[in-house]
UniProtKB/Swiss-Prot annotation:
Catalytic activity: pseudouridine(1915) in 23S rRNA + S-adenosyl-L-methionine = N(3)-methylpseudouridine(1915) in 23S rRNA + S-adenosyl-L-homocysteine + H(+)
PANTHER family, per the entry: METHYLTRANSFERASE, RIBOSOMAL RNA LARGE SUBUNIT METHYLTRANSFERASE H
UniProt enzyme class: transferase
Assembly behavior: Homodimer.
Major location (coarse): cytoplasm
Name the UniProt record assigns to this protein: Ribosomal RNA large subunit methyltransferase H
Length: 156
């Protein structure tokens, strides 16, 4: 099973890349994390936020593996504890197939893409920089995995 993080945005600061890479390399080979960056659409006077989100959604869809489980990050998504994320990860592994976790652009995710998602999830009630979300998501996935393995990384 592969965890694929599909994130709108590119040219992240080095510390974001390093933070993401640190947690991605900690994952076991059978549960690796891959990042696919989606070039954001430029907003102009003639393009509405809805148009931008639709164009980005088409790029996101093209990056998704066929038949993958889609988890869209959204401010109105389900607020999970780390233990609940560990339970979800266990379920995803049991069901098999890849899981794509989608981080939208500055305007968010297209409503049609969110409707297609198997799950809407939020990392925090706080507004976070999109680059930071990559690092936090990778860390939480590693922490969730560590819970499933009784690894000492996560202490209650």
């Amino acid at each position: 099973m592969q965890l694929l993080i599909v994130a709108v945005g590119h040219k992240m600061p080095r510390w974001i890349e390093d933070g993401f890479a640190e947690y991605a390399k900690r994952m076991p080979p059978e549960l690796r994390i891959e990042l696919r960056e989606i070039k954001p659409e430029q907003r102009s006077g003639s393009r509405t936020a809805a148009t931008v989100m639709q164009l980005e959604a088409a790029r996101i869809e093209a990056a998704l593996p066929k038949g993958c489980r889609i988890v869209a990050l959204d401010e109105r998504g389900k607020d999970l504890t780390t233990a609940a994320l560990a339970d979800a990860l266990t379920g995803w592994q049991r069901e098999g197939g890849d899981v794509a976790l989608i981080i939208g652009g500055a305007d968010g995710l297209d409503p049609a893409l969110k409707a297609r998602a198997h799950m809407l999830m939020r990392l925090s009630s706080l507004t976070l920089p999109h680059g930071m979300v990559r690092v936090l998501l990778a860390e939480q996935l590693y922490r969730a995995w560590s819970i499933t393995q009784n690894h000492p990384y996560h202490r209650v």
